[in-house]
């Protein structure tokens, strides 16, 4: 009985400390998500891990999540995560798939090959992210901004023949995220001042999860 009480007390203390740490985080401020909602939702928790990893990259930067971008037909397309630093804007498309992943830059669909030779198709994430980038540029009204596309898959999958010809497009697994962005930063030209970074952040912030209306979020079509 005494041991059970100690275990329960330990769990509560651990939860309290983690929640206090979370409540002070930039992720909480940017997302508006509650701690319990994050740790019980796989998609939100994955996004939380992405955010924390990107926070570790040295240098001035801004990070936004769930940017709802207006389209000409009145619908929206959602950029999962946007990282802004002195070398440009990095747009992340997250895919939580397992199995073997096959595809190429131009195909409309990619294939997920699971156990027992079961195959599932899904929308080409490079084309999805190209769509996000198109509408991000429209918000900025600046063509000179360097915008890079990164498709991030779960560590549970195996990427097969997915190299992109465009040097501004990367297809990686989650464990390579920070390493990849650091490498892209190191090999890119500085194009944005701190003032530019903040200005771009403020423009995109108006379309994020914390500022988009509930109607916009409810009407967003997930693909």
Feature map (PLM): residue ranges:
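Surface-exposed interaction regions that form or flank ligand-binding interfaces
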Residues: 1-77, 84-88, 100, 117-223
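Active-site ExK catalytic segment of metal-dependent nucleases
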Residues: 91-100, 106
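A short, glycine/acidic-enriched catalytic loop
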Residues: 111
């Amino acid at each position: 009985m005494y041991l059970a009480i100690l275990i329960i007390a330990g769990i509560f203390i651990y939860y309290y400390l983690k929640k206090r740490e979370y409540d002070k985080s930039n992720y909480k401020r940017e997302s508006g998500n509650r701690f319990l909602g994050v740790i019980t939702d796989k998609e939100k928790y994955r996004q939380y891990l992405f955010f924390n990893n990107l926070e570790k990259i040295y240098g001035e930067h801004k990070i936004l999540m769930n940017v709802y971008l207006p389209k000409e037909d009145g619908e929206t397309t959602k950029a999962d995560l946007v990282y802004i630093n002195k070398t440009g804007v990095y747009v992340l498309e997250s895919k939580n798939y397992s199995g073997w992943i096959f595809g190429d830059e131009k195909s409309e669909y990619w294939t997920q090959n699971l156990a027992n030779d079961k195959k599932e198709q899904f929308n080409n994430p490079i084309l999805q992210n190209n769509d996000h980038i198109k509408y991000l540029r429209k918000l900025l009204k600046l063509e000179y901004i360097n915008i890079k596309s990164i498709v991030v898959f779960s560590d549970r999958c195996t990427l097969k023949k997915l190299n992109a010809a465009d040097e501004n497009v990367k297809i990686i697994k989650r464990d390579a995220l920070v390493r990849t962005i650091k490498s892209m930063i190191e090999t890119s030209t500085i194009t944005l001042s701190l003032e530019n970074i903040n200005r771009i952040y403020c423009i995109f912030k108006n379309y994020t999860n914390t500022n988009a209306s509930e109607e916009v979020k409810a009407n967003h079509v997930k693909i």
